[in-house]
Amino acid sequence: MRVTTSFPLGTLRDTPSEAEIISHQLLLKGGYIRRVNSGIYAYMPIMLRVIEKISTIIEKELNNIYCSKLLLPQLHPAELWKKSERWEGYTAGEGIMFNLKDRQGKEFGLAPTHEEVITSIASEMINSYKQLPLCFYQIQTKFRDEIRPRFGLMRSREFIMKDAYSFHSSKEDLAPFYEKMEKAYENIFKNCGLDTVGVDADSGAIGGAASKEFMVTADAGEDSILFTESGSYAANIEKAVSLPSKEIPLIRSHEEWIETPNQKSIVDICQNNNLDASQIIKVVIFLSLIHI
């Protein structure tokens, strides 16, 4: 009786048809979440308890590296995004930002991320390098107009995200803090009982000189990673690079004309003339006609 009163679970006997992966199925059947609309979910009491415990773990690690928690607005004026030249990219075409106009016709967007707002605030409050470094973080609801919401909470239109923003006087000051933040993330995942792989990643629309993602390997997901057997290198498939192929020296000691009839590609030439691709230079000439 007490369990029912404290945690009204609302479990399901059958698996909902829209649940494609096991995590989504278990969250729905276990009464952790309830679907409100496509990509929109209600967090039920037992799920909220889980979120609060995870938040406590996150806060402890970030407070240990002197980050300050705050709460930023979810409704952003378009001017801030236009100033950073990201408004069009986030709202036009397949942009992921929900946007609207108020009664006065002013444009706003529902936050998919908070770089613009926190940068605006920091520019007003930081007057000297002596105030640096500074790091702010929040655990806040985000909105993204996903083209195809799927996999439950994995790709939804409304979700909770922890994001942190730090400000530094130089790159030399940033580097050691980046390492501290990386270690904090490792501790967070460890304390949550997750085995992760740190991989190089594409910064995407957010940008940045470097980006690292912590991946949990699973059968279900939307990302793929490539890694070496030794574990010395791992990267998101969008960012992964390979070592250049070993060059094979050209044996011929003198220049020689070679006929290449019906050999339309480098592969054809290599196969018909016992050559390696590293021994060939391809010259392409473009003819441009300019009308004035």
Q: What role is predicted for each listed range?
A:
Residues 1-290:
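TRNA-recognition modules of translation machinery and tRNA-sensing kinases, especially anticodon-binding
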